[in-house]
Amino acid sequence: MNRLLIFRNTLFSMSSETEVKFRVGDLRTVRRKLHAAGFRLKTRRTHEMNTLYDLPGGVLRKHRELLRLRQYGSEWKLTFKSKGKIGRHSTRDELETGVSDGKLMDAILRALGYSPSFRYEKFRQEWTDSKGEVVVDETPIGNFCEIEGSSRWIDATAKKLGVNHADYITKNYATLFAEWRRETRSRAQEMTFQVVKKGHN
């Protein structure tokens, strides 16, 4: 039984998240463009570790749902994301809450029958103009930006940053990593700096 069905059918309201990614060639250039577009730095470069969980048989993956425990600096968050809609932008409903003890939450999830299915790591900066958010991610498979806000705002912001619609990426990091593995024939099983470096040698 998928226990998340019970979770979803509670009275909690799910917020909607609309976003796109694009690849970044030069981090300094994109930061300069963000400054020029009126963005301010919300969060300095911070280490982030993400663990996705699933039930036996990959129940969530088959339904294109996601359960993630994230450590961002010293903070922890637990997030559930629905299947969502993929068009020019990616839109998914989500539930998210802060967690005071990430290791305890990991133990709770395992006790409920979930197990880690994928880990991915990055360094992230967060920028905002009070209408939406742009994050700059340094990952083991390259650098990316993520623009999150209303669809119209996303397109306007992308234009300011010199990003065309053809450059939009709506795939998540797990999918991007799987594609990268096929292209590079890497043996890495998770998207962490140490494992990717070892698996790519």
Describe every region a protein language model picked out.
Residues 1-13:
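N-terminal amphipathic/basic-hydrophobic helices that include classical n-h-c signal peptides
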Residues 3-6, 47, 164:
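Intrinsic disorder/low-complexity signature
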Residues 11-132, 167-201:
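N-terminal strand-loop-strand beta-hairpin
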Residues 41-42, 154-156:
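Short loop/beta submotifs within extracellular cysteine-rich repeat domains
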Residues 136-141:
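A contiguous pocket-lining binding segment that forms or flanks enzyme active sites
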Residues 152, 158-164:
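A hydrophobic, small-residue-rich beta->alpha segment in the mid-to-C-terminal subdomain
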